[in-house]
Amino acid sequence: IHKPGDQNRNQKGDLAFNYKNIPVSVEVKSVAKNTIKQNLFGWSGKAAVKSSDKKVLTFSDGSTADVAMLPRGQFTILAVCCHAFTGSWKDFQYCLNTDLPMPNSGSLTELQKSELISVLIPVQWPPVAPFTTDLQSVLDRAIQ
């Protein structure tokens, strides 16, 4: 397990390791306290998944956009700490990068949206698909 350097453009995420000889990277975020609401099923909130600065990204069709959103595929798994919901630093939920929502910005084309991750990711406690507390199942899906 290692932490890729912040300036490493080839490997992103907060943790990187090999799982069954396949490289996996995990981006770790937490639920923003100011987004938490109690509902009939438990708790809901949002995790902010974004770049620290806006940057110009080039998309597969050659178009560009100046955004703070992260490109899809830059890490393998999103891990969200759910301390704000449960009071425990041990409670996490996990989701594959490919299952995260696209942004709904009107200034982006459909192709650009499909290649980006939404900045605010909705999460609930207890977790609702595509999130799960079962990291093993997400790791197994990641290497398929």
Residues of each region from the PLM?
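A short acidic/basic microdomain associated with nuclease active sites
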Residues: 1-18
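Surface-exposed beta-strand edges and their flanking turn/coil or helix-capping segments
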Residues: 16, 38-41, 93, 107-109
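Active-site beta-strand-loop-beta-strand hairpin of nuclease catalytic cores
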Residues: 17-27
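Non-catalytic C-terminal interaction segments of nucleic acid-processing enzymes
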Residues: 64-65, 84-144
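Catalytic cores of nucleic-acid endonucleases
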Residues: 29-87
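Short connector loops at helix/strand junctions that flank enzyme active sites
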Residues: 10-12, 21-23, 72-74
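Residues in well-ordered beta-strands of folded domains
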Residues: 27, 79, 93-95
